[in-house]
Amino acid sequence: VYGEVAFMPELRYRANFGIDIYNSSQDTFRPSTIPVANTEGNPESEPEATAKTAKMYNWLFEQTMTYNKDIKGHSISALAGWTMQYQRDESTYAFANGFITNNIPTLNAGTVTRGNTNASEWALLSGLARVQYNYKGKYMLTGALRADGASRFGKENRWGWFPSVSAGWRLTEESFMKSLTFIDDLKLRASYGLTGNFRIPNYGAQGEVAYYSYVLGGSSADVVKGAAPKSMPNPELHWEKTAQVNVGFDAS
């Protein structure tokens, strides 16, 4: 959904909001009449059942102000705004066996022997500004700045700054090019900008702890669960930045 308000002909405000929702569930039951591969010729095996769910929702909220003005061949266009994006993922898994009958395929008819739940989330907050200048379609200049803050990085490295600038010169609008009738349009252009990448695990900077099974005891050993580091924290993780330079011309 979106809404737009014009405060004056040159100044407009726009807000956008969108949301994506995903839900999935899967239940399986394998009766004893369907043997598994390692039954060594046994025509029947123990029934098994699983239950899985997965959920995701992602929302994006954007607000921008735009200003456009033309004064005697001088055209100015400016944009400023900010965006917020948030996503959460959840999943569950359960496995059961020990069913005494094939007629009740729900987990509570057996013994749940393992399972887990997972949840993760991330957020991105961004601010942006851009100014474009054009003089009679002959000289063009654009400057932009974007700042992004990502929850995936540590507190000291969450923000990345990404400037860009571009310029263009349409030579065919110059008087000294008018005699060259075989060229309809010729423009020189150059640009420089930084882009960022924050595609790392949601908690890559913090480290994670997970539960693992291990054997405890001697002759009458039991399998128990214990917590141990799954990944080590790295608070120095920061935005990956890529510089792009483009120089060229357009001709027709």
Say what each PLM segment does.
Residues 1-30, 41-252:
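Extracellular/periplasmic, surface-exposed regions of secreted and cell-surface proteins
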Residues 32-34, 38:
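Short amphipathic helix-turn modules centered on a small-residue break
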